[in-house]
């Protein structure tokens, strides 16, 4: 198998899941904007995401694209006031006549006093058609909450569930009958002194419990 590095102008912070739209690939990052690629290897700037904010994620549902992002700047040892918002678009191509994001809607919040920060959105459409959002950072819990796949709104009465702790940048994945939760543990953004590492657990239910390969609950 041939291994190749990405080329072009691939700088991006907190990139989202890569999504295909009309033969091109898109990823979004913290601060707004993102990257576009025609082959998945060579990237250039040009993706457009309004709202700025942090750590977005994106998913295709039917013939539309749902983007989630956080209106907060990052974790804090004392908690962080913030919110996760979702918005739709018919296309991710900023040159298309159909390109227009809907008004963002708040689907999760943190008040600065609880053990969770509303940041680092992760989206998953399960095999049963249910839509899930994970969020949170290393100073508290990772939480999961169910969204309506037709609106992107939080389902009324659905309360977030704590599924992990002391990690961030969570990504929920479904594969072969199992729900997987990938997240990062340690510290980032310190060059060679960074201690970031990826942790993973799996569960038969999207709401957990997620356990690792030796049975430890995340």
Predicted regions, residues:
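Carbohydrate-active catalytic/glycan-binding domains of CAZyme proteins
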Residues: 1-218
């Amino acid at each position: 198998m041939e291994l190749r590095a990405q080329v072009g102008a691939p700088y991006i912070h907190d990139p989202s899941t890569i999504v295909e739209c009309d033969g091109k690939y898109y990823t979004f990052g913290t601060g707004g904007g993102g990257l576009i690629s025609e082959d998945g290897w060579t990237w250039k700037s040009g993706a457009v995401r309004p709202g700025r904010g942090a750590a977005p994620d994106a998913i295709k549902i039917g013939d539309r694209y749902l983007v989630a992002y956080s209106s907060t700047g990052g974790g804090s040892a004392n908690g962080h006031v913030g919110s996760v918002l979702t918005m739709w678009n018919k296309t991710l191509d900023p040159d298309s006549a159909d390109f227009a994001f809907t008004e963002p809607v708040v689907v999760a919040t943190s008040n600065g006093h609880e053990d969770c920060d509303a940041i680092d959105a992760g989206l998953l459409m399960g095999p049963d058609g249910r839509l899930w959002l994970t969020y949170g950072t290393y100073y508290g819990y990772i939480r999961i909450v169910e969204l309506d796949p037709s609106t992107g709104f939080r389902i009324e009465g659905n309360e977030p569930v704590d599924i992990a702790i002391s990690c961030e940048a969570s990504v929920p994945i479904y594969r072969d009958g199992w729900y997987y939760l990938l997240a990062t543990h340690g510290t980032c953004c310190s060059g060679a002194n960074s201690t970031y590492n990826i942790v993973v657990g799996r569960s038969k239910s999207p709401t957990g419990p997620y356990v690792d390969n030796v049975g430890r609950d995340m």
